[in-house]
Every structure is written in C-alpha cells, then in structure tokens.
Regions:
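Feature marking well-ordered beta-strand scaffolds used for ligand recognition
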Residues: 1-173
Length: 173
C-alpha cells in the first residue's frame, strides 16, 4: 500500500510498502519519480501505511508493531524511524486506517484483540498509544468517518468489513 504526503516546500512525496519496509520517493513530477529514502522493516508481502501530519505509520503482517516514521525532513531527503511501537503484545497487523478529523489511526486484523478494530491515539504523534479495541469479530478492512451534520453529527463511526460475515458499524473510538 502507499500514501501521499506534501513536504514544507510543496513538493509531493509517496510512502510505499515494500517487501522489507517502506520506501519514500519524490513524485512532484510523476513521470520522473525519484527514490529518496527507505525505512527497513520485517519481511512480508503485506505492508500498509498511512500519513498523518508529519508522520507516517506503517504496519506489516511480518511484525514490528507500528513503525513510526518522521517525515519532517523529507524535503532534505531524510525519513527517520522514530520507533517500532509495540504494546499489549501487538506485533502484526493486516491493515491500518486513518481518520484525520479525529487524529486517530485504527488497526485491523492484528495479532491481538481477536483481529478486531483497535483504536490508537495520536495525541503524541511520535508515540502512538492504543486506547481501545473492539474484539467481537475479525476486521479485515474499515473506513472511519467523523460526521459533521445529521443524526450522527460529532460522532466518529467505523464501518468494519468482516470478510464473509458482512459489515458492522461501530461508535469509535
């Protein structure tokens, strides 16, 4: 998986999951992308990443918990691994979801919480913290939305896809 980011200079960047970590490239000119840095990680065919502010958060089915990457110097060609955040036995994750409106990321298909939805606070972006979980069913993928109007105004709702078991809606976090 991959996500885009814009540096302070206005140049465009992509952060992409690779077999052994995450690659970062400048894509300001999409016909001439330039690899600028990479962050090593576990060997896995499945790496997922989300960008929130000046940080990228990577997960993998190979382990390492949440890889926290500082993108503040990306314009200078540097991406720094802040930490491999592990908590409560968390190591592997299938998917990571972000909600920029709330400042939370969510883990799906992790090795803890029965593979359910895990809420992670980014109050301190360099040190994400697990603050809740829904472990009734495995969650393969999700979309989390903060409603601004209507009957759900001010609420963060998670649409959780449980594979062949259907779709479940949750109040989050």
């Amino acid at each position: 998986d991959g996500r885009g980011s814009t540096g302070a200079s206005g140049r465009g960047y992509a952060v992409m999951g690779l077999e052994r970590g995450f690659g970062c490239g400048e894509v300001t000119d999409p016909t001439n992308p330039v690899v600028i840095d990479w962050v090593g990680g576990p060997s896995s065919a499945w790496q997922d990443v989300k960008v929130m502010g000046e940080y990228a958060y990577g997960v993998s089915e190979g382990g390492f918990g949440i890889q926290v990457m500082d993108l503040s110097e990306i314009d200078d060609g540097r991406v720094r691994l802040v930490q491999n955040k592990r908590q409560f036995g968390h190591e592997t994750t299938h998917n990571i979801i972000s909600n920029p409106d709330s400042g939370y990321i969510y883990l799906c298909g992790a090795n803890i919480a029965n593979g359910g939805l895990i809420a992670v606070s980014l109050d301190n972006p360099a040190d994400p913290r697990i603050v809740g979980q829904w472990s009734t069913h495995y969650v393969h993928d999700a979309q989390v939305v903060t409603y601004t109007e209507g009957p759900y105004a001010g609420r963060e709702i998670a649409f959780c896809l449980n594979g062949f078991d259907g779709l479940e809606l949750l109040d989050a976090p």
